[in-house]
Amino acid sequence: GRITDGYEELKKLQENPPENCKFLGIVPREEMVDLYNMADVLFVPSYNELFPMTILEAVNLHVPLVLRDLDLYKDILFDRYMHANDNDGFKNCLLKLKNDSDVYAKYQNESRLLSEFYSKEHVLNMWREFYLSAYKDKQEELLNKKK
């Protein structure tokens, strides 16, 4: 199926990766910030994701994102990332980031904005507003029933 398509080809690449590609396996959490600080871009070509922590971790360090064009990302990342659906598209995104410092700076800033949106303080405020609004609506509903 779609998830396992190309598995054998990817397995061969993993066993004999290009010089600039390292498969690290499971990385302890305390080492993740160092890895993200070394990264120029977070590239996630997955066909299927939930809300991935890797993206939140990368945007906290203002790393530009190159992702597959999934509907989920549109809803949670607000087009603040580069996206494509095939190898040529991904290559073009990565080359733009590599060769155009203005494009790179733009997507660093987009990651910064995502980091602010998903900060603990902002998420807490969104939940607070949600619950206060729900409480207010329920109070109004109860008052209207009494009339």
Pin down the residues of each PLM region.
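Nucleotide-activated donor-binding/catalytic signature segment of Leloir-type glycosyltransferases, i.e.
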Residues: 10-27
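Short alpha-helical donor nucleotide-sugar binding micro-motif in glycosyltransferases
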Residues: 34-39
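Conserved acidic donor-binding segment of nucleotide-sugar-dependent glycosyltransferases
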Residues: 78-88, 96-101
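Conserved donor-nucleotide binding/catalytic region of nucleotide-linked donor-dependent transferases
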Residues: 96-113, 136-142
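C-terminal alpha-helical cap of glycosyltransferases
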Residues: 120-147
